[in-house]
């Protein structure tokens, strides 16, 4: 059975020691969906939102969040990210925005949490910018899509 890596032998939360691990190229992709009314989505897409460019703001927020994941999640290591990308795609057929984040580095530990944090914060930023016109926006399906590098191997979500 696999054990929790952040719990020591006494059952206490502990930061994993990665000092003996070899650097490898690691990459992770995550996504989130932001469901809203067609009118709210149209406001974003037409550039009529009074707060400005929602997609640009969400993209920057996601990038900033990835870089600060170690400050937000207690046992995450500070990482020297070599790439953070946040892509936003309007999906009018389901009245949603899909947020996809990609994080990459050459290092001793994975970037899954950074990718998940980037997607989550970008989605939260969309909510924040649009809550004045619609309060019942739903953020859903935040998940890891893919990770590569490291000893646990390659993972692709089904």
UniProtKB/Swiss-Prot annotation:
Active-site residues, Swiss-Prot/TrEMBL: 128
Gene Ontology MF: a single term: GTP 3',8'-cyclase activity
Pathway involvement of the protein, from the record: Cofactor biosynthesis; molybdopterin biosynthesis
Swiss-Prot/TrEMBL keywords: Lyase, Molybdenum cofactor biosynthesis
Domain of life: Bacteria
Example GO biological process: Mo-molybdopterin cofactor biosynthetic process
EC numbers on record: 4.6.1.17
Catalytic activity: (8S)-3',8-cyclo-7,8-dihydroguanosine 5'-triphosphate = cyclic pyranopterin phosphate + diphosphate
Binding annotation for substrate: 75-77, 113-114
Pfam families found in the cross-reference section: MoaC (PF01967)
InterPro entries named among the record's database cross-references: MoaC (IPR023045), MoaC_bact/euk (IPR047594), MoaC_sf (IPR036522), MoCo_biosynth_MoaA/MoaC (IPR050105), Mopterin_CF_biosynth-C_dom (IPR002820)
Function summary: Catalyzes the conversion of (8S)-3',8-cyclo-7,8-dihydroguanosine 5'-triphosphate to cyclic pyranopterin monophosphate (cPMP).
Similarity remark: Belongs to the MoaC family.
Subunit structure and binding partners: Homohexamer; trimer of dimers.
The name this protein goes by in its record: Cyclic pyranopterin monophosphate synthase
Organism: Histophilus somni (strain 129Pt)
């Amino acid at each position: 059975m696999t054990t929790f890596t952040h719990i020591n032998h006494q059952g206490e939360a502990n930061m994993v020691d990665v000092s003996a691990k070899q650097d490898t190229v690691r990459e992770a992709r995550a996504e989130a969906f932001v469901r809203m009314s067609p009118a709210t989505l149209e406001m974003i897409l037409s550039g009529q939102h009074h707060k400005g460019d929602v997609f640009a703001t969400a993209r920057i927020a996601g990038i900033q969040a990835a870089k600060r994941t170690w400050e937000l999640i207690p046992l995450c290591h500070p990482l020297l990210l070599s790439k953070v990308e946040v892509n936003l795609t309007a999906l009018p057929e389901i009245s949603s925005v899909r947020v996809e984040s990609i994080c990459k580095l050459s290092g001793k530990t994975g970037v899954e949490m950074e990718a998940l944090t980037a997607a989550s914060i970008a989605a939260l930023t969309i909510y924040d910018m649009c809550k004045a016109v619609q309060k019942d926006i739903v953020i859903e399906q935040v998940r890891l899509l893919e990770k590569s590098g490291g000893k646990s191997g390659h993972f692709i979500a089904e």
